[in-house]
Amino acid sequence: RATIGRGPNPLLQNHPLMAIHPPLLYMGYVGLALPFAITLGSFINETKEDWVSKSRSVARVAWVFLTIGISLGAAWSYEVLGWGGYWAWDPVENVSFIPWLLCTGFLHSSIVQRKINSLVNWNYVLIGLMFSSTIYGTFITRSGVLISVHSFSNGPIGQYLLVGLLISLISLLFVGWKNEGYFKNSKKIDSLSGKFGLFTLNNILLSIAAFIIFIGTSYPIYFEVIN
C-alpha cells in the first residue's frame, strides 16, 4: 500500500459524485464506439439489413450513461467554487456535450430510417461523427492543448488520439464511398411539417448546436496554428 504521495487533486476530493461522474462519461464514450463498429462491420461484411437497429440499441445505452454522467458532473461542479455553476463555456464540458447532442439526434433519425427508409446516409454520417467526437473530446481532455479546469494531465497521448481520429474519419468515408449505391435507395422527406419532417428538423437543430459548440471550442486551436 502506498504510504507517501501527493494524493488526488483537492478539486477531486470534495464530493462523492467524483467516484461516479467520470466512469459514467467513460462508459458513454466507449459505448459510442459500438454503433461505429457495428455499422462499419455490417457494410464491410455486406450484412446491411439491420445495422441501424443494432446501432440504435447500443446507442441508447451509451446515451443513458452520457446523460447521467453529464448531469452528475453539473451537480458536482455547482458545488465547486469557481467552476461556473452547473455549466460554463469550458472546453472539456463542451466536448462532452457534443456527442450527447449527436447521439440524441441519431436516436430520433434512426426511427425515420426504420419506419420509411429515409435519412439512411444521414444516420451513417451521424454514427461516424458520434464516435469521432468522443475521440476529439478525449484529445481535448487529455492533451492539455486547451486550458480547462477539468484538465489534469498533459502528455504525448494527444498525437495518438489525433491519428485515431483521422483513421476513423477516413474509414467512414471509404466504406461510405464503397457503398454509395446503397445510400441512393434512401427515400426523401418532402416536408418538415409532418411527424418525420419534425424528426428531421430536430436533427438539424441538434447538429447545428453541436457544430457551433465544436467551432467555438476549437477556434483557439486553429487560431494558434494559423498564427
State where each predicted segment sits.
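Polytopic transmembrane helical bundles with strong interfacial aromatic enrichment
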Residues: 1-227
